Amino acid sequence: MQRHMLKSKIHRAAVTHCELHYEGSCAIDEDLLEAANLIENERIDIWNINNGERFSTYAIKGERGSGMISLNGSAARRAQLGDLVIIAAFAMVDEAELQAGWKPKLVFIDEGNKIKGHRDHVPTQTWT
């Protein structure tokens, strides 16, 4: 059996560009792509924390070290500059890989879209 699992997540990145007339996609700083184990043309889901929008597109390379998160084409209508987003990708993982310890790559971002930390799991949610 295969399971559809979270593979990659870039958490709380700020949108830096919205390019309506650029060919559709989301340009992501190459440093962030690599840290999250994402590749060019990979399908990604984007969840806008500010307005609740959820949509899918594909990743393209943004300038390395720039902090770029550019929503292009129709995706540009789903966010405004400065909105915080979660970028995620999923993969089909078989039971043997899961049993062998397969883990996702979770990347946490600071206010300048620079990496502030990594994890390989989502913590258990508790009551506060």
From Swiss-Prot:
Keywords: Autocatalytic cleavage, Cytoplasm, Decarboxylase, Lyase, Pantothenate biosynthesis, Pyruvate, Schiff base, Zymogen
EC number assigned by the record: 4.1.1.11
Binding, substrate: T57, G73, S74, A75
One GO-annotated biological process of the protein: alanine biosynthetic process
Reactions catalysed according to its record: L-aspartate + H(+) = beta-alanine + CO2
A GO molecular-function descriptor: aspartate 1-decarboxylase activity
Taxonomy, superkingdom: Bacteria
Cellular component, GO annotation: cytosol
InterPro entries (UniProt xref): Asp_de-COase-like_dom_sf, Asp_decarbox
Active site (record annotation): S25 (schiff-base intermediate with substrate), Y58 (proton donor)
Keyword Cytoplasm listed: yes
Pfam families: Asp_decarbox (PF02261)
The protein's annotated pathway: Cofactor biosynthesis; (R)-pantothenate biosynthesis; beta-alanine from L-aspartate: step 1/1
Residue runs in coiled coils: none
Function: Catalyzes the pyruvoyl-dependent decarboxylation of aspartate to produce beta-alanine.
UniProt subunit comment: Heterooctamer of four alpha and four beta subunits.
Similarity section: Belongs to the PanD family.
Protein name: Aspartate 1-decarboxylase
Organism: Burkholderia ambifaria (strain MC40-6)
